[in-house]
Swiss-Prot record:
One of its GO terms (molecular function) is acetyl-CoA carboxylase activity. Keywords: ATP-binding, Cytoplasm, Fatty acid biosynthesis, Fatty acid metabolism, Lipid biosynthesis, Lipid metabolism, Nucleotide-binding, Transferase. The keyword Hydrolase does not apply. Pathway: Lipid metabolism; malonyl-CoA biosynthesis; malonyl-CoA from acetyl-CoA: step 1/1. The lineage of its organism: Bacteria, Pseudomonadati, Pseudomonadota, Alphaproteobacteria, Hyphomicrobiales. GO terms for cellular component: acetyl-CoA carboxylase complex. It catalyses: N(6)-carboxybiotinyl-L-lysyl-[protein] + acetyl-CoA = N(6)-biotinyl-L-lysyl-[protein] + malonyl-CoA. This is Acetyl-coenzyme A carboxylase carboxyl transferase subunit alpha.
Length: 317
């Protein structure tokens, strides 16, 4: 069952009619609905193309949060072989919001990490909806340290509304853990490729997204705070989230124009959730090309380029 967003009502209506016609034909073989179904399918594609060519920032936010959008585990299964997950931060506990380990990417050994939101109630609770606690970022630091030691490229897949803001997380040093993870990314002498596959929220995202190359899926978002949070701070009114999203410049197109990201990975018509295999394959090709481009650079150059890239953002924006 497809979950339709509020602006997709024309698509929902048309696909509802298609479903009814197909059901009618299946119940009575004497009824041929193929011509009408074909016409409606053309109208669906036309309607989808029209709607998705004009999405505003708030609508893209809704697409980025779509519950059926492919998550870290979907990318991990499709892009990597011999994935060996690691658990625990060796200080306090395990945090399933961040998944991390080692794998082969098209035959090349790599370190992989990213946030996992989960896809049903049980898994969402297990992964804390992708909002990591300090233990998650300290686990990420463990993986990053080992990647540097064994000279393995790092691939990060970002999908979080932000780090978990609970009292316990703050007591155990949430801000420090995020800062240390960011610092670790800046210091590595191996390539780091980061892809925002859904939401890239605040320090919780950038803690694992300080890459030599940073990409975003076409309908993903990347921001210092959620639109609802920004609206609450600026206007004391979270219902103005749509206005905040527009002003915050959080879309892939906005951030590419500002020089924050290096490229945009196109999504299938209707969003990544409509055709996960296609968008995952496209992301894999972009990652592969980036690794090929960076493989000839020395460790010192990779580290220097990465630091300069992020320093320039602060100086020029």
């Amino acid at each position: 069952m497809h979950n339709y967003l509020d602006f997709e009502k024309p698509i929902s209506d048309l696909e509802g009619k298609i479903h009814e016609l197909k059901k009618l034909a299946s119940e009575d073989e004497s009824i041929d609905t193929s011509d009408e179904v074909g016409r409606l399918e053309i109208r669906v594609r036309e309607s989808m193309a029209d709607i998705y060519s004009k999405l505003n920032a708030w609508q893209k936010t809704q697409v980025a949060r779509h519950p059926q959008r492919p998550h870290f585990v979907d990318y991990a299964k499709a892009l990597f072989t011999e994935f060996t997950p690691l658990a625990g931060d060796r200080k306090f506990s395990e945090d399933a919001a961040i998944q991390a380990g080692f794998a082969r990417f098209r035959g090349q050994p790599v370190a992989v990490l990213g946030q996992e939101k989960g896809n049903d109630t049980k898994s969402r609770l297990k992964h804390n909806f992708g909002s990591a606690r300090p233990e998650g970022y300290r686990k990420a630091i463990r993986i990053l340290e080992m990647a540097d030691r064994f000279q393995l490229p790092v691939i990060t897949l970002v999908d979080t509304a932000g780090a978990y803001p609970g009292v316990g997380a703050e007591e155990r040093g949430q801000a420090e853990a995020i800062a240390r993870s960011t610092e670790m990314c800046l210091g590595l002498k191996v390539p780091i490729i980061s892809v925002v596959i859904g939401e890239g929220g605040s320090g919780g995202a950038i803690a694992i997204a300080v890459g030599n190359r940073v990409y975003m899926l076409e309908h993903s978002i990347y921001s210092v705070i959620s639109p609802e949070g920004a609206a609450s701070i600026l206007w004391r009114d979270s219902t103005r989230a749509k206005e905040a999203a527009t002003n915050m410049k959080i879309t892939a197109e906005d951030l590419k124009g500002l020089g924050i990201i290096d490229g945009i990975i196109p999504e299938p018509l209707g969003g990544a959730h409509r055709d996960p295999q296609t968008v995952i394959a496209a992301a894999g090709d972009v990652i592969s090309n980036a690794l090929g481009e960076l493989s000839s650079r020395s460790g010192e150059q990779l580290r220097s380029d990465r630091r300069q890239k992020f320093l320039n953002m602060g100086r020029n924006l």
